[in-house]
Amino acid sequence: MPISAETADTRVVARDAVVNTKIDRTTAKTREVHDIASRNATTRLLVETANDPIVVAVLFAGGKGAMNISRNGKIGWGNGNFLVRSRPYFLERGITTAIIDAPTDQKYDLRHGFRGSANHATDIGAAITHLRSTYNLPVWLIGTSRGTNSVVNAAVRLAADSADGIVLTSSMLTWNEKGDNLLGFDLEKISGPVLISHHRNDESRVTPPEGVRNLQSRLTNGGPMKVAWYRGGYAMGNPCHAAHYHGFNGIEEQVVSDIVAWIKQTKP
């Protein structure tokens, strides 16, 4: 389901955020580019608003995580990512989406330690605060693959700026040479709702299904928690890429539908 912008204008909605608004005549009500000041850097968000939204979901792609979002909202990298390509399914169900890009001082690659850093959590906290105040809605973080490192890092480190809940899809569950895995974080500090979504046949060596049990056992101090398992779909190409079971290829709508149902069930 393509997203096509028809008209555009630019406005300032907050002291630290410039927004470029584009009216969408398909799924999204509006399409906006927000530049959020944090530390000595800026983090860009591509926000697509739903009709009568109930939540804002910040989407964290995997891999290098540098989306290269342009000023007019074009995504330069990662269009095939599970969460990025599934935006219409969220929008149809009343979830406003915000794709988060890499900050300007780390704009080429979030791997090799940045996803687990205090600076990254600070940037995410600034985005949460901005979105919550701009839209007056709960804010959830949803990550896939390496994006789950970013989500968990924020959930562990943030207090007042924390999200209302998190969703972890195709979670990073083993040591790897390019970054963190979730079991290395202080998971016991997570206090909000958590949904874990995983494919039974995920063949990526860094997101093994058998690791979910260890993740689940560490999430002991939070709110509601659920593990959702999936089968089916299609497996194409690299097992660690988005066209394989790792990216829920062919069953995207079902996975998103379940995520939204969980959010509605647990949101304040």
Features from the language model and the residues they span:
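Alpha/beta-hydrolase active-site loop
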Residues: 82, 86, 108-134
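The feature captures the conserved acid-bearing segment of alpha/beta-hydrolase catalytic domains
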Residues: 165-230
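C-terminal catalytic histidine-bearing segment of alpha/beta-hydrolase fold enzymes
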Residues: 222-268
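Conserved alpha/beta-hydrolase
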Residues: 87-107
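Primarily recognizes the serine-hydrolase "nucleophile elbow" in alpha/beta-hydrolase
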Residues: 129-189
